[in-house]
Design a protein with these regions (language model features):
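Dinucleotide-binding Rossmann-like beta1-alpha1 core, especially the glycine-rich loop
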Residues: 75-151, 155, 161, 284-285, ...
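Helical element adjacent to the flavin cofactor pocket in flavoenzyme catalytic cores
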Residues: 165-226, 230-237, 421-432
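C-terminal catalytic lobe of FAD-dependent flavoproteins
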Residues: 327, 332-438
Length: 438
């Protein structure tokens, strides 16, 4: 009797092993995450840590994680000052700030809590600054203060201004490195990462247990019960592959930085930002210290002629035409034509950017800077030319597997990196609720 019981147990284990082996051979998963940026990787990590029995994979088109936006940014840990109270951005940024610092300490990831000054240099900016301070209080930004000219000098000896917001918990970190740590956690928990897997199509399979097939441009396939897409610069295109609306549309904007010469880096201790002008969609040029001791200046914001175009010479005519023929882009361009021309001029002429920087640190001269790296921001637009300024989630239309079993993260702009652990928790909640994952 005991022998038969043992035999049945061994047989069950054997059959379970065969099924697991077959799944691995066919690359069958409970959840596949499309996109190995910081949001996709953090989300894959979170769902697997919650449900270690699930088979989860990340597919990423590049040869490494965090290759685009997650690895090409200023490296700032934001505190949640700018965002509309009650928005997901405001909530998730403040939550993500605390989660990030806790995670960095647990993993011994290097970071610096250098703080940030948002500096007003005239009376009009002082009025805007006061409104921004009220917003930061509404958002529960930790320990934020309104400081005078004397205190500005105490914090940043070479900076001038009438008044400023001081955020002591704003910091800097290498977000590409952080994404690698998320990926390491994910792999150690049993997750699979498929690199060089550029998604070409989604199809319904004939297997009811794994109803979705994801095919790459190299004709590789994975099957899955459920799909989460976090496509970043390609998020609208990925969503369209499943029959989703093309909106919001992604239009790429390149942000070009200058580098401060090493012998002048002592002029900057922490992040120094201008007061944002509500008439324009971007924050303006600022001073950002880096983990390696360098200081980045900028960025500007110019239309990229390619979705992943980090230089003026990076041009894809199909992608460029796709952007400029979009009605929302045309309306936005007309709305911001003056600002757009200024940004292009600043891109071509370094002295114009330096002039902006001298409002805060007069000691910076044209010969103290040189051209530096660039990043590309996935800016989501609606049909009316409005910049979509919060996180957007979507799923397909209809009653098929591609509609019912897929969740798209359509827009995760700055402060997406700071918010990544908080976004991951929210996405995991959505996956559990939408797909009844226990």
């Amino acid at each position: 009797m005991l022998s038969r019981t043992i035999d049945r147990s061994v047989l069950r284990l054997y059959n379970t092993g065969l099924r697991t082996y077959a799944q691995a051979a066919k690359k069958q998963y409970d959840i596949v995450v499309v996109g190995g940026g910081i949001v996709g990787t953090a989300s894959a990590r979170e769902i697997l840590l919650r449900h270690p029995s699930l088979k989860v994979a990340v597919v990423e088109k590049e040869h490494k994680l965090a290759f685009h936006q997650s690895g090409h940014n200023s490296g700032v840990i934001h505190a949640g000052i700018y965002y509309k109270p009650g928005s997901l951005k405001a909530k998730l940024c403040v939550e993500g700030l605390h989660l990030s610092y806790k995670y960095f300490d647990e993993k011994n990831i290097p970071y610096k809590k250098v703080g940030k000054l948002i500096v007003a240099t005239n009376d009009v900016e002082v009025e805007r600054l006061n409104d921004l301070y009220k917003r930061s209080l509404a958002n529960n930004v930790p320990d934020v203060q309104l400081v005078d000219a004397k205190r500005i000098k105490e914090i940043e000896p070479y900076c001038q201004g009438l008044k400023a917001i001081w955020s002591p918990h704003t910091g800097i970190v290498d977000w590409g490195l952080v994404t690698e740590y998320y990926g390491k956690d994910f792999r150690q928990a049993g997750g699979d990462v498929h690199l060089n897997f550029e998604v070409a199509k989604f199809e319904e399979s004939k297997d009811p247990n794994y109803p979705i097939v994801v095919k790459s441009k190299r004709n590789e396939t994975v099957q899955s019960k459920y799909i989460l897409t976090c496509g970043g610069l390609q998020s609208d295109k990925v969503a369209e592959l499943t029959g989703c609306s093309p909106l919001p549309k992604i239009v790429p904007f390149r942000g070009e930085y200058l580098l401060l010469n090493p012998d002048k880096c002592h002029l900057v201790k922490g992040n120094i930002y201008p007061v944002p002008d509500p008439r324009f969609p971007f924050l303006g040029v600022h001073f950002t210290p880096r983990m390696d001791g360098s200081v980045w200046l900028g960025p500007n914001a110019v239309l990229a002629f390619k979705r992943e175009g980090y230089k003026w010479s990076d041009i894809n005519l199909f992608e460029l035409f796709d952007a400029i023929k979009f009605p929302g882009f045309i309306k936005m361009a007309l709305k911001y034509v003056g600002a757009g021309m200024q940004e292009m001029a600043k891109s071509a002429l370094i002295p114009l950017q330096v002039k902006e920087l001298q409002k805060f640190i007069p000691d910076v001269q044209d010969y103290d800077v040189k051209r530096g790296p660039a990043g590309v921001r996935a800016q989501a637009l609606d049909n009316d030319g409005n910049l979509v300024d919060d996180f957007v989630f979507d799923q397909g239309k209809g009653d098929n597997a591609l509609a019912k079993n897929i969740l798209h993260c359509r827009n995760a702009p700055s402060p997406g990196a700071t918010s990544s652990l908080a976004i991951a928790k929210m996405i995991a909640d959505k996956l559990e609720n939408q797909f009844n994952i226990k």
